[in-house]
Amino acid sequence: HSLIPRFGLDGVAPEAAAEEEAVELPEAELTPLPLTPAGHYLVAARPAVTGKQGTRNVVLQPESWYAVQDTTVYPLEDADLVRLLDNADVTLDVFNSAPLYAKAMAAGGWGSSIVWDGKLAAYLLDASASKYQISELIPAYKAAAAFTCTDYPDAGRLADLFARMKAEITACGEDALYNEIEFPLAQVLADMTRTGVLVDKDGIEQFG
């Protein structure tokens, strides 16, 4: 550039940008859910892994629900989920509330601990997407990891992913739409689906 020699800068190299230091993340503690859970948890499912066995598609690794609190990951059986879903001492940010409401209602509950659903938020933010999966949303929202977890690879990024999605909903001016219409509707639809299945079952039994 012609200004460089004029100001005597031709021997001066620009300072290289400092490289971002690689931070070594802690490994999550994997432990059973406490008998008396309390506080705020993030709940999601590790998707099932399928593969071929001869000509048949088989499940190589079943879907597995888990909860995250700070840097602890709790693998969840159905009984654990039921203890979380209607618990006055617990609040839950979840990804995909529909099957969780179904589990709660099947156990005589209502899923009252669920306060936010990331899958519903993803739909609201991009209604044209063909599917909504945590593994695809993490790079889309550049969600940072708080820890690593070999058994549940997405667990460490859930907190940042959910925070970024909440911020995006606020930035789009859609808090009221989400909180007052979409989120309550999810619970109602889950109840209607359950009731519809029960009605159909009774009707089939009467018809038979």
Name every feature range the model reports, one short phrase each.
Residues 1-18, 106, 112, 137, ...:
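Mixed-charge, glycine-rich, non-catalytic linkers/tails in nucleic-acid processing enzymes
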Residues 2-140:
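Conserved RNase H-like, two-metal-ion catalytic cores of nucleic-acid enzymes
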